[in-house]
Structure formats: structure tokens, C-alpha cells
């Protein structure tokens, strides 16, 4: 079985779109389509139902997804097992658009000679298990579990408190505000279709919404970042929430606005997760770099979820 085709299938399943999977994998959309078609031919079943706006898993696709992920993890472990001491440091950043990727890129710029492999895993449970088994060396995550509930040998440390911002189109009532308080968001429609039950980012925004009496809508399929920006640009009612360091690019005509939140400033708590006893020399270098470059946000005007701790 072609593992590149399996990897492509998993990417499309996660993104819900061939185009977004192509961007994540760094290949053309045509290459993604060919790989999926070859895999479907090899398996003798259709894995996706194509629609004008994306791709939905068929029943067979849903059945194939868990073992496909297991297969890729097994491949990762096999490759790592034959490169002790010489292999690249493997770090999960969730997505290349968000703050963890910037943190890792900053380390790469400071240590350009250190081999790195950027990994993108979906949920914290998968990431922690990958760290535990040695499939990856580290992961950037918001850690919702207390230390006593983490697997033996798993270590975490806070590396970034990232301010959350309001994202609106030019016609929104808050678009012209230089900053607003979380309480001022009450009554406004906040749309975040990427929130998935059970994920750490959903836990963060659920608690944030509850703390300030906000209503967060998750309706509609998640077609990715670009369709979200398109909707916000043309809406006078919908807004969304994003991290300050989330990398977003939109056409000039969209005129989207990023509005700071204050009094208090909600911050998303990014932590680095690794396994005690991991002797990869670059892991220690990464930890030292993150400690030395962590912004000082010791401010009473910050808000974090109760599970985030200090």
C-alpha cells in the first residue's frame, strides 16, 4: 500500500477539502486527487463523496480512517527506530498557521543547523500518546489535564500565553474599535465552525464563553480558513476569535479587522510536552530557547481557563 496515498487520504479527511489538504502537504490538488483515486482503486471502495464545496467521508472512508492513522504512526516509529542520534527532532505544531509553528520557526532561525521535522497531529490525546511512545519528541498543546492525570513520564511546561483577538469584517459594529472587553462581546454572534468537541481549543473557548456570557456558534461544516474569512468579510453580524499569532492572509478587498481584547486579556496557554528521559540533544536546545524567549506576561489583567493554572 502506498503510504503517501494513505497520508494524503488522512490529510483530506482532516481538512474536508482536497485544496486545503494539498496546501498542507505542499503538493498540487491534482496530485492529491490522483493519490486518493489510486488508493480507492487499490482498496476497491470509494473513500470520499465529492461535493462542490469539499469532500465527505463515505462509510468505507470512516471505517478506513482509524487504521490508516495507525499505519502512519507505525511508519513514523519504524523510521525513527533506525536513526538514533542522527534523526531530526520531530515536533508537533497542530497547524502551520498558528503560534506553535511560529515558536518552532523561531527556534529554527536561532539554530539553523539543527534538523527539524514538523508534524501536524489533530488532538491532544493523539499527540501525548505519540510523545509517550517516541513517535514524536515534543508537541505544543494547551494542556487541559492536571499533571497527575498525564501518562507516567510525560512532562509539560508553559511556553506562551497568546492573546486572543476578535476578527470581523469591515461592516461589523465592532470593526472600528481599537479594542473591546470580553463583556462587550455579549450579544454578538461569534462563529467558530472549527471547534470540535473533545479538543483542547474547544475546551478553552467553551470556558471563555461561559466566563463572559458569550454565545459561540459552531454551525455549518468547517470548510477551512479561507471560506471563513470570505463569510466574515461580507457579514455585518458574524465575528470570530483567533490567536494574535495566527497567520491569516486575505485579499485586500476583504478589509478584515483584528480587534484587541482587554480588561481582561484572554490568553491561550500553549505548553511544550515531552517525555522524561528523551535524550535527543535538540530537545534540550528547544526547551532552553523557549524559556529564554518566552514573553513576560505576568499581568493581573489576563484571563486563562481554570485548568490552565499559573
How would you describe each model-predicted region?
Residues 12-26:
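Short helix-boundary/capping micro-motifs
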Residues 28, 35:
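Residues within the DNA-recognition helix of helix-turn-helix
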Residues 38-57:
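A short LG(V/I)-centered, amphipathic sequence patch enriched
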Residues 124, 132-135, 194-257:
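Hydrophobic hinge/microswitch elements
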Residues 155-164, 168-190:
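Flexible hinge/capping segments at coil-to-helix
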Residues 229, 244-257, 263-310:
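C-terminal effector-binding regulatory domain of bacterial HTH transcription factors
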Amino acid at each position: 500500500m502506498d503510504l503517501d496515498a494513505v497520508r494524503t487520504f488522512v490529510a483530506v479527511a482532516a481538512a474536508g477539502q482536497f485544496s486545503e489538504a494539498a496546501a498542507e502537504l505542499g503538493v498540487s490538488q491534482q496530485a492529491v486527487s490522483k493519490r486518493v483515486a489510486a488508493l480507492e482503486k487499490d482498496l476497491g471502495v470509494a473513500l470520499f463523496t465529492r461535493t462542490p464545496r469539499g469532500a465527505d467521508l463515505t462509510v468505507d472512508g470512516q471505517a478506513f480512517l482509524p487504521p490508516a492513522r495507525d499505519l502512519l504512526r507505525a511508519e513514523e516509529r519504524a523510521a525513527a527506530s533506525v536513526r538514533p542520534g542522527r534523526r531530526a527532532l520531530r515536533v508537533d505544531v497542530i497547524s502551520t498557521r498558528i503560534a506553535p509553528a511560529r515558536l518552532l520557526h523561531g527556534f529554527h532561525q536561532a539554530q539553523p543547523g539543527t534538523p527539524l521535522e514538523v508534524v501536524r497531529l489533530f488532538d491532544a490525546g493523539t499527540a501525548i500518546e505519540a510523545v509517550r511512545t517516541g513517535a514524536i519528541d515534543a508537541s505544543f498543546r494547551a494542556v487541559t489535564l492536571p499533571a497527575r492525570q498525564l501518562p507516567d513520564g510525560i512532562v509539560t511546561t508553559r511556553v506562551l500565553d497568546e492573546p486572543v483577538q476578535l476578527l470581523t469584517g469591515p461592516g461589523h459594529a465592532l470593526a472600528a474599535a481599537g479594542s473591546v472587553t470580553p463583556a462587550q462581546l455579549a450579544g454578538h454572534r461569534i462563529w467558530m465552525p472549527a471547534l470540535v468537541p473533545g479538543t483542547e481549543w474547544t475546551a478553552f473557548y467553551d470556558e471563555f464563553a461561559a466566563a463572559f456570557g458569550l454565545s459561540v456558534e459552531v454551525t455549518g461544516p468547517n470548510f477551512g480558513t479561507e471560506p471563513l474569512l470570505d463569510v466574515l468579510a461580507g457579514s455585518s453580524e458574524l465575528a470570530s476569535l483567533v490567536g494574535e499569532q495566527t497567520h491569516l492572509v486575505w485579499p485586500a478587498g476583504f478589509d478584515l479587522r483584528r480587534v484587541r481584547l482587554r480588561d481582561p486579556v484572554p490568553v491561550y496557554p500553549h505548553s511544550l510536552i515531552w517525555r522524561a528521559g528523551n535524550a535527543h540533544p535538540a530537545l534540550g536546545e528547544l526547551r532552553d530557547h523557549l524559556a529564554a524567549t518566552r514573553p513576560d506576561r505576568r499581568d493581573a489583567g489576563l484571563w486563562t481557563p481554570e485548568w490552565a493554572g499559573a
